[in-house]
């Protein structure tokens, strides 16, 4: 779902949104992010579907009038935050579609894996080991914020969504995706896929 930001809320000091147990679990798997047959194989298979949805949702967001957008780079001129980027499975394709991507993750190991892979394929992505609330407190702003398969790992949902709102420029788009709230989705998505 993409939401347009219509008001400006000043960043404020927030409780941590980071769940240390989840961070430890993903950190332990960080060397496997780009192994298409490894523990993140379901995410690799799902990425083309997610990217089609992300492209369709973000490509019509407002951007600088001088930005030339062609079909191969429909996200050109957009500064996009990929919050909870993991190993960069969405950051890389968004960059290839023309976005200026900042990928953020609470796991330093995930950021190291993302940086190594991006360097290996010649992509320039600004990866950071930080949190949404820290970026909001620093008054960072983005045309779009993508939080895909992240909110189920957040310790304080209210603080997280407030931080995401603060990170959006006026008229920006917030896109969040998560699993259905069913037992089957929980088992297949959170435990089997991640």
Regions found by a protein language model. Give the residues of each.
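Residues within alpha-helical segments
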Residues: 31, 48-51, 115, 119
